[in-house]
Curated annotation (Swiss-Prot):
Catalytic activity: (2R)-2-phosphoglycerate = (2R)-3-phosphoglycerate
Cited NCBIfam families: pgm_bpd_ind
Active site: 62 (phosphoserine intermediate)
Pathway entry: Carbohydrate degradation; glycolysis; pyruvate from D-glyceraldehyde 3-phosphate: step 3/5
Identification of the protein by name: 2,3-bisphosphoglycerate-independent phosphoglycerate mutase
Amino acid sequence: MTNHSVILCILDGWGNGENNQFNAIAQAYKPCWDNITLQYPKSHLITHGSSVGLPDGQIGNSEVGHVNLGSGRIVLQDLCKINNEIKYIKDNVYLLEFINKIKKNNGICHIAGLLSDGGVHSSYTHILDIINTLSDFQIQVAVHIFLDGRDTPPISATKYISILCEHIKHLNNINIATLSGRYYAMDRDNRLDRTTKAYNAIAFANAKRYEDPLTAVQDSYNLGITDEFILPCIIGNYQGMKPQDGFIMTNFRSDRVIQIIKMIIGDIKTDNHITLDNTIGMVKYSDKINIPCLFPNNNITNTLGEVIANNQLHQLRIAETEKYAHVTFFFNGGKEDMFENEDRIIIPSPSVATYNLTPEMSAEKVTDTIIEKIKLQKYSLIIVNYANADMVGHTGNIDATKQAITTIDQCLSKILNCIQNTNYVLVITSDHGNAEEMFDVKNNMPYTAHTLNPVPFIICNYNKKIRLKNGRLCDVAPTILEILNLAKPKEMTGVSLIEQV
C-alpha cells in the first residue's frame, strides 16, 4: 500500500507547440507553469494515431485521450474498428433487422450525422457506405447533415456537401432533408433550446426552407455564420418524420449525440414529438439509452479507477460540465456506474453562447472544490479536468485563449501551494493539443481543431529523485500505480515512465 496520494490534473487541449505568435500557451502570462517546467521532472506524451488506437496521422480527441489515460493500454478506437468492419455492412445483422422493420412498416430511413472527415465524432465515408446499403435495399432515405467547422476548418462545409451530392445523384431515393450546425444538433451541455431547434427541423420540417444545401450554406456565409453555427434548415420538399420511419445516428462518439438521440426516442420531452420504434446508433451511446447499435463496444476491464477501487481506496472525479463525462464515463472505459468509494463532483459550466466570452469558465470553482477535498486527506486519487485550453481554443480567439491559460496557471499555483507538506503528488498532463496552434497560416484563417503535437507530462511534489521517459497516454495509469505502490494489472500494457536517478 502507498504512502502517497495522487492528483491527476488533465489540462484539456494543452499541447507543446512552437513558440510563436499563434501559440496562446507560449504567449500567455503563466508564471507558475514556467516555474513548474523548470523545477520538476518532465517529458512528453504522444496523443494521436496508433499511439492511442486511431489510424496513423489521425488527430486525437478528448474521448480517445481519456479512454487511454484511464485504461492504461492502447484501446482500439471506434473509428479504426468501424473502418475495419464497415466494409461488411451489408451483412451487419443489426442493420438488416433495422431495414426489415422499415420495409415491413412501409417507412423511410432518416440517417443523421456529422458530415466531416475530422475523425473525432464521425466519418463521412461511413455515412456514404450506409447510404449505399440502404439504396441497394431500395429504402427511401432522408439525410440529416450536421455541419462541423470545429474539427475541420470553420468554412469547409461545401466541400463535404458536394461530395455527398455527387455520391447520391446516381442512387435512387436518397435526398438531403435538413442541415444543422453542430452547435445546435450536437450540444452536450443541456442547452436544450439548441437541440430542440435541430429536432424540430428533423422531426417536423419546422425551419427555414432552401431549394438546395449549398445555397443554404452560402446564405449563412453571407451573414458571417460559419459551419458550426449554421441554423437548422430544411432542404427541398422534406416534410418531416412519420411514426413508421426508422432513424440511424452515424456519429460514433457518444457525448454530443445523447441529447438529440434522447429527443428522437422521447426520453427528453418536447412540446411536440413523433414516436419512432425503430432507432439505431453506430455504437452503444449510453447504458441509459435503450437502442441497438451497429457496432457493439469492447469491454474494458481493470482500468485505473477499478484498480483503485479493488484496493479499497477512495477516489474523486471532478470537472465542469463540458468535461464531466470525460473524467467519469470515458476514463472508466465507457462505463457509467461508479466504482466503490468513487465520488464525483460536477461544476456547472458558464451559460454563454461561446466560451471566449468567459475564458475563465468554471476553473476557479473547480479549484476551490479540489482544495477543500485535499484538506480532507480522504482520497488516494483525485482526477480533475480543466476544460479552458480546449473549449476556449476551439473558438479560435487567441486573446481569450491566453486569458484561459492564465486562469489555469493561477489554479495550478493554488493546488501546488495546498499540497506542500502533504503526501499528495501532482501529475500534470493533457489529452491532446489545441491552444498551442490558434491560426492556420496556410489557409489564412483561425485554427479551431486539435493538433498532432505532443503534450506535457510532469510530476510535482514527489519526494523521490526521478527522471521521466517520453511515452503515450496509456503510460500515465501505470505511472500513477507506481507512485501509489500498487500492482499493475496484466490488462494494462502501458508502462511506467518513471526512471529512478
